[in-house]
């Protein structure tokens, strides 16, 4: 698990390995599950119908689970079978990541991953059409703000803390906006533009700064 985590993101690997036992496995599970579906959404060789279908299949496979002990890995194997040669290891091993977390919190991670996969499928069906800032708010919540809410729940489960959830949403939106800025040229090359109409880098930078500023207490 740690090897794949390090290969996938050195940025997230370092803070995750410093977490105490139990929380470390939960956060690693959440990160790898989310990264697994993110790789589907951004896959350069799949068209949007294939992306949407795969994400919906993942969502349904996770919705059908009951516990870590009875987790049906075959459901995900079947979801990936038509595209397994095209998908990265972090995606095809999603079932392994799903059962990394302690059994008491793992279903919360499945629920979050399932919901996010469903939202990603919806946006893929729409061709990731972002017309207004309201569209951008909806997209950044669906694929990132909700991650902040999940992390709040993981901390709440482990420490009995209740972080401010509105800060978590802003933090996720801000990070996603930074990703959109960084990947803008690559996204355009594959026919996707996450910028609202009339926006350039200046407006997206301002959006990212505003969201990150509103979340300062969360990141502290």
List PLM regions with ranges.
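Acidic catalytic motifs of isoprenoid enzymes
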Residues: 1-220
């Amino acid at each position: 698990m740690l090897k794949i985590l390090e290969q996938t993101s050195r940025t997230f690997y370092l803070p995750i390995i410093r977490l105490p036992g139990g929380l470390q496995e939960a956060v690693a599970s959440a990160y790898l599950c989310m990264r697994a579906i993110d790789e589907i959404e951004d896959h350069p060789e799949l068209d949007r119908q294939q992306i949407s279908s795969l994400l919906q299949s993942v969502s349904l496979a996770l919705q059908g689970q009951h516990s870590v002990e009875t987790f049906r890995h075959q459901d995900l194997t079947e979801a990936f079978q038509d595209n397994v040669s095209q998908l990265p290891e972090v995606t095809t091993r999603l079932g392994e990541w799903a059962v990394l977390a302690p059994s008491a919190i793992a279903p919360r991670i499945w629920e979050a991953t399932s919901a996010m996969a469903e939202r990603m499928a919806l946006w893929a069906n729409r061709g990731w059409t972002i017309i207004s800032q309201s569209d951008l708010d909806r997209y950044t919540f669906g694929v990132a703000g909700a991650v902040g809410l999940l992390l709040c729940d993981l901390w709440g489960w482990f420490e009995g803390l209740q972080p401010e959830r509105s800060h978590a949403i802003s933090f996720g939106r801000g990070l996603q906006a930074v990703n959109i800025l960084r990947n803008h040229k690559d996204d355009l090359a594959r026919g996707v533009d996450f910028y609202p109409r009339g926006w350039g880098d200046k407006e997206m930078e301002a959006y990212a700064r505003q969201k990150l500023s509103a979340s300062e207490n969360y990141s502290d």
